[in-house]
C-alpha cells in the first residue's frame, strides 16, 4: 500500500529522508564528483558523464510503471494535502477544482503522449482543468515585468498563472517555480528530452512513442538562468521529499533533483550557490559565496520606452522600435552581463 504524503508545503526540507539516503547505494558523493557539461546547450549537455550516470540511475531503478488512466488513484496518496486532506493541485497549490492530468512537460514538445514519460508519476501532476487549459503548451518563463500586456488566470481567489500568448510565455506562482523546475529536470534527464531550454531540430529529437505523432522541439523553459533561478527561489519542501518517497514505493525510482538540487548546477558546469538550503546541505558546504551588488536601470529617453528590473533581469520596453544602447557596470567586474535583444541578464 502506498503511504499518504505527510509532508508540509513550503516547509523547507533540510534533511534527506531515510529512503533517499538508502537510494544512493554507492553514496551520492560519487555522482557529485562526476563531470558535468561545459556547454550552455541542453542538447550538448546530455553527453556528460554526470548526465549519463543520473539517467542510468533513474532508469535502472524504475522497476515498475503505472498507466495514464490509473494516475488519479495514486495521486490520492502521493499528492495528498496534509496527510489525507484532499488532492493538492500542482500550479494552483491548493485542493478542489475539476481535476485533470497535467503534462508539466507539454506533450507537443515531447516524444511521449500517455506512455512512458507520459504516465510517469514523477512527471504528471493533478491540476484543475481550467488552469490546465490556460497553461496550454507555452514556454515557461518570466512574464511579470517583462510583458506588460500579459493575461492572468485565477483559481480559488488567487492568481496562479501569468501568460502572454503572442510571446509563448507562461509564469507560475513563486511558490511553485522550484517544484516545476525539478520536474522538468527529471523529464530532461530520465526520458532524454533535449529541448529543456533551447529549440532542438527534428534530427536531434528522440523517436516517438507508439502513441505520439508530434514533437515541435520547442524549449519548455526560456533559459538555463531562469531554471536555476526558480530552483533557488523555491527550495525543496518536506512535501516534495515525502512525495518522492511515495512515488519511489510505486515506481522504484526517485527524482534525484529533489534529493540533490545541486545536480542542476553541476550538470551545466555552474558554481553552486552557498546560500541555498537543500536536503543534503551539500551546497552550503561546497558552494561559492556570491558577492552582493545592486542592480539599477534607466532609460535614456523615457518618451521612447522604459526599463524594468526583476531579479537579475533587465527588460526594455517596447521590445521593438528603438535600440538598446548598452550597459555599464560599477565596479567593472561586479557581474557578467549578457544581452539578447532588449533583455539583459
Regions found by a protein language model. Give the residues of each.
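Domain-level detector of nuclease and nuclease-like folds
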Residues: 94-100, 104-287
Amino acid at each position: 500500500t502506498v503511504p499518504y504524503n505527510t509532508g508540509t508545503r513550503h516547509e523547507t526540507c533540510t534533511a534527506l529522508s531515510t529512503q533517499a539516503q538508502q537510494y544512493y547505494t554507492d553514496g551520492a558523493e560519487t555522482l557529485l564528483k562526476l563531470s558535468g557539461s561545459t556547454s550552455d546547450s541542453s542538447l550538448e549537455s546530455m553527453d556528460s558523464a554526470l548526465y549519463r550516470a543520473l539517467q542510468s540511475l533513474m532508469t535502472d531503478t524504475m522497476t515498475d510503471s503505472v498507466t495514464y488512466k490509473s494516475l488519479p488513484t495514486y495521486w490520492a496518496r502521493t499528492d495528498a494535502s496534509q496527510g489525507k486532506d484532499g488532492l493538492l493541485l500542482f500550479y494552483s497549490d491548493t485542493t478542489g477544482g475539476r481535476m485533470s492530468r497535467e503534462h508539466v512537460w507539454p506533450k507537443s514538445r515531447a516524444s511521449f503522449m500517455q506512455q512512458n514519460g507520459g504516465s510517469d508519476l514523477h512527471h504528471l501532476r493533478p491540476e484543475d482543468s481550467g488552469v490546465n487549459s490556460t497553461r496550454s503548451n507555452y514556454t515557461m518563463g518570466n512574464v511579470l515585468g517583462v510583458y506588460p500586456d500579459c493575461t492572468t488566470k485565477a483559481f480559488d481567489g488567487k492568481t496562479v498563472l501569468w501568460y502572454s500568448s503572442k510571446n509563448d510565455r507562461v509564469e507560475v506562482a513563486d511558490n511553485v517555480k522550484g517544484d516545476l523546475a525539478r520536474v522538468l529536470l527529471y523529464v530532461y534527464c530520465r526520458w532524454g528530452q533535449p529541448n529543456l531550454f533551447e529549440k532542438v531540430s527534428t534530427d536531434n529529437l528522440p523517436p516517438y512513442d507508439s502513441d505520439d505523432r508530434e514533437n515541435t522541439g520547442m524549449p519548455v523553459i526560456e533559459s538555463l538562468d531562469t531554471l536555476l533561478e526558480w530552483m533557488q527561489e523555491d527550495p525543496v519542501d518536506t512535501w516534495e521529499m515525502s512525495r518522492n518517497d511515495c512515488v519511489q514505493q510505486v515506481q522504484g525510482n526517485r527524482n534525484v533533483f529533489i534529493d540533490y538540487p545541486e545536480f542542476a548546477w553541476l550538470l551545466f558546469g555552474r558554481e553552486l550557490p552557498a546560500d541555498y538550503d537543500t536536503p543534503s546541505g551539500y551546497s552550503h558546504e561546497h558552494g561559492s559565496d556570491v558577492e552582493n551588488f545592486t542592480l539599477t536601470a534607466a532609460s535614456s529617453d523615457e518618451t521612447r520606452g522604459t526599463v524594468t528590473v526583476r531579479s537579475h533581469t533587465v527588460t526594455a520596453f517596447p521590445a521593438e522600435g528603438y535600440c538598446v544602447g548598452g550597459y555599464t557596470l560599477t565596479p567593472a567586474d561586479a557581474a557578467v552581463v549578457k544581452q539578447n535583444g532588449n533583455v539583459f541578464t
